[in-house]
């Protein structure tokens, strides 16, 4: 009847022929749940383009994390046995010299002991200034030596045996050392950073003067014998233990072991208790109480010097004089044990 009319009129084109696009769900029904990742006809091209900038950091691609190499572990510093034995011998000689020097002190005869203390103070100034290298090194060394002389004279000549003259000497020495560093324009920038080192040098020098003051009070000479013997034994045993068994290592950069610190403090305390049973005015208990403080402060000060030296080397500072660096620890230990002995004698004896 209508030859120009197609037979497909009135039929839906999608009823017989599937669509070229992806098939979807039937009309009126919810989509079926997905059971797996959708398959793509082609692989996603590798992203090659400029790196995206991250906030607060450099740009990177997501696959950069796999390209990062793991950080290499820093090998621990080896423990040199001959060096540990040498430092142990120096600590023993220093302790014997201070203890025997205290026996030469008597009423009206303080100068021999003060001369021995001044020699130790000069060693302290040499070792610590060469190891720490503050600005205007020569000025700091000369001022510290002059401060040592003033402190020793004040300790011997003062009417009342006390620490006030030594405190005034330390304050004056620190002020002169800082002013000497400020005079030179080159050293002004480093004055603030090196103030702590200058303070340690000046105060450490004056700390040895407390032994002269301690020798002037009752039971002072006996207290010096007990405390410095405990400190010397603790330093000696700690270094000998490090030469034999430096375990466990406290830090990879510090060639010291925890066993030496603990065993040294224990044997130093035991030695002081044995001395207390023979010295007049002491008992084993009181001597052990005084000795444990001196031994612990000495070995901890020695250990702190090792950490400070490792920190300077890690910061890139060139190593200083070999002898000065290794004399620094025992000298610092006895410098801290001296005021500790004075405090324990005044407070508990």
What are the roles of these predicted feature ranges?
Residues 3-12, 17, 27-29, 79-80, ...:
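C-terminal transmembrane helix-loop-helix hairpin of multi-pass membrane proteins
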Residues 68, 116-127, 147-151, 172-179:
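Central hydrophobic cores of alpha-helical transmembrane segments in multi-pass inner-membrane proteins
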Residues 190-273, 277, 281:
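Internal active-site segments that recognize and position negatively charged phosphoryl groups
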Residues 135-146, 165-168, 189-201, 251-263, ...:
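Cytoplasmic-side transmembrane-helix entry/capping segments in multi-pass membrane proteins
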Residues 100-120, 159-175, 217-234, 284-299:
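Structural signature of hydrophobic alpha-helical transmembrane segments
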Residues 152-167, 179-190, 209-220:
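Transmembrane alpha-helix boundary signature
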Residues 72, 121-135, 176-191, 236-252, ...:
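C-terminal ends of transmembrane helices
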Residues 1-123, 129:
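N-terminal signal-anchor module of multipass membrane proteins
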């Amino acid at each position: 009847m209508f030859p120009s009319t197609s037979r497909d009129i009135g039929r839906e084109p999608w009823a017989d022929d599937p669509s070229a696009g992806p098939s979807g769900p039937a009309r009126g029904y919810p989509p079926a749940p997905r059971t797996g990742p959708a398959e793509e006809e082609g692989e996603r091209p590798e992203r090659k383009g400029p790196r995206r900038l991250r906030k607060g950091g450099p740009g990177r691609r997501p696959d950069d994390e796999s390209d990062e190499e793991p950080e290499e572990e820093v090998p621990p510093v080896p423990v040199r046995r001959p060096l540990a034995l040498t430092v142990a011998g120096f600590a023993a000689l220093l302790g014997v010299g201070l203890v025997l020097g205290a026996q030469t002190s008597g009423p009206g005869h303080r100068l021999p002991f003060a001369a021995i203390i001044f020699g130790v103070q000069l060693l302290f100034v040499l070792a610590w200034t060469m190891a720490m290298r503050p600005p205007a090194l020569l000025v700091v060394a000369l001022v510290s030596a002059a401060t040592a002389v003033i402190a020793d004279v004040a300790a011997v000549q003062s009417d009342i045996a006390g620490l006030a003259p030594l405190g005034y000497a330390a304050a004056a020495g620190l002020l002169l050392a800082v002013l000497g560093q400020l005079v030179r324009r080159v050293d002004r920038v480093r004055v603030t950073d090196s103030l702590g080192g200058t303070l340690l040098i000046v105060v450490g020098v004056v700390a040895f003067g407390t032994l002269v003051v301690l020798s002037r009070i009752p039971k002072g000479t006996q207290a010096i014998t007990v405390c410095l013997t405990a400190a010397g034994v603790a330093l000696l045993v700690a270094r000998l233990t490090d030469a034999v068994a430096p375990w466990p290592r406290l830090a990879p950069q510090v060639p010291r072991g925890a066993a030496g610190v603990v065993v040294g403090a224990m044997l130093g305390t035991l030695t002081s208790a044995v001395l207390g049973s023979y010295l007049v005015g002491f008992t084993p208990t009181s001597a052990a109480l005084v000795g444990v403080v001196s031994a612990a402060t000495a070995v901890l000060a020695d250990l702190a010097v090792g950490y400070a030296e490792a920190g300077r080397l890690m910061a890139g500072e060139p190593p200083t004089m070999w002898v000065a660096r290794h004399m620094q620890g025992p000298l610092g230990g006895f410098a801290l044990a001296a005021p500790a002995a004075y405090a324990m004698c005044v407070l508990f004896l």
